[in-house]
């Protein structure tokens, strides 16, 4: 029995993943032609194995990490230099401002001084033209004062005084031969102190006086006098002081002196025995 061999073969499909067709996208299954004749006694070929599954698409690569920005060493130093320059410029501007302020102040003072000087000059010129000259400047009056201290080598009357060393003072008054000479008439306060002392008391009367000499008077004029009686205990050591002081109207050329009754009993220490005056 003959079998008909003209029955159609089943369609066979080939897959070509690498081939590309202008009208089909990649990976499309194309059918094989059905008109391929089968040979006699040829068996039907086994069906082709199924195509292997397509590998999964590779994972998308991660984007590269951004590189850290490189630090620019020059930026730090440049900023520091700019800051220093800014402060230097600021200090210079401040100094310039202070200098201008001082200059303005000095110019203002100079202008005021010139104005006051011109006003004084104008006033003096007007006074000269009118005939009323400005009064002369007042002279500072020299103070009339004297303070003399005891002189240990004094051996005669009237008492001599120290007028150079120690705590002495002479101004506007002369000292001549134990006396103070008045140069200007006026009111004066005259004072004198004498310190007496002895090893053994004899109770001799002691006197202390200030007197004045002037060519107008025929004899000495006693101004002040002090007398001491019974001032100590007989036979014992003793010390006593006598002080005189008063205000007098003295005239020019008056000479003032001090006299005591017992010169040998006088202690001439500068703080104990002295003579002076001053004008009121």
UniProtKB/Swiss-Prot annotation:
Matches recorded under InterPro entries: FASL, TNF, TNF_CS, TNF_dom, Tumour_necrosis_fac-like_dom
PTM section of the record: The soluble form derives from the membrane form by proteolytic processing. The membrane-bound form undergoes two successive intramembrane proteolytic cleavages. The first one is processed by ADAM10 producing an N-terminal fragment, which lacks the receptor-binding extracellular domain. This ADAM10-processed FasL (FasL APL) remnant form is still membrane anchored and further processed by SPPL2A that liberates the FasL intracellular domain (FasL ICD). FasL shedding by ADAM10 is a prerequisite for subsequent intramembrane cleavage by SPPL2A in T-cells.
Region (Disordered): 20-70, 117-155
Compositionally skewed regions (Pro residues) per UniProt: 43-69
Main location: membrane
Ranges that cross the membrane: 81-101
Matches recorded under PANTHER family: TUMOR NECROSIS FACTOR FAMILY MEMBER, TUMOR NECROSIS FACTOR LIGAND SUPERFAMILY MEMBER 6
Protein name: Tumor necrosis factor ligand superfamily member 6
Source organism: Macaca mulatta (Rhesus macaque)
Origin organism lineage: Eukaryota, Metazoa, Chordata, Craniata, Vertebrata
Gene: FASLG
């Amino acid at each position: 029995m003959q079998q008909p061999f003209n029955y159609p073969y089943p369609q066979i499909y080939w897959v070509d993943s690498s081939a590309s067709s202008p009208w089909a996208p990649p990976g499309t299954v194309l059918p094989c032609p059905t008109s391929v004749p089968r040979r006699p006694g040829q068996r039907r070929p086994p069906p082709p194995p199924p195509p292997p599954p397509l590998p999964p698409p590779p994972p998308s690569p991660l984007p590269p990490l951004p590189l850290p920005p490189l630090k620019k060493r020059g930026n730090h130093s440049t900023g520091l230099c700019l800051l220093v320059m800014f402060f230097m410029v600021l200090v210079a501007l401040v100094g310039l401002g202070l200098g201008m302020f001082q200059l303005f102040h000095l110019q203002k003072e100079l202008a005021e001084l010139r104005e006051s000087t011109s006003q004084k000059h104008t006033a003096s010129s007007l006074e000269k033209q009118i005939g009323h000259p400005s009064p002369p400047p007042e002279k500072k009056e020299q103070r009339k004062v004297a303070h003399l201290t005891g002189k240990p080598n004094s051996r005669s009357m009237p008492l001599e005084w120290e007028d150079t060393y120690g705590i002495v003072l002479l101004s506007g008054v002369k000292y001549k031969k134990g006396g103070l000479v008045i140069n200007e008439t006026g009111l004066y306060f005259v004072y004198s102190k004498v310190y007496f002392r002895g090893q053994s008391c004899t109770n001799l009367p002691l006197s202390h006086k200030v007197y004045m000499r002037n060519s107008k008077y025929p004899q000495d004029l006693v101004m002040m006098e002090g007398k001491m009686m019974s001032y100590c205990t007989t036979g014992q050591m003793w010390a006593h002081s006598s002080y005189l002081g008063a205000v007098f109207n003295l005239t020019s050329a008056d000479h003032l002196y001090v006299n005591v009754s017992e010169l040998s009993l006088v202690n001439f220490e500068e703080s104990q025995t002295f003579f002076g005056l001053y004008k009121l």
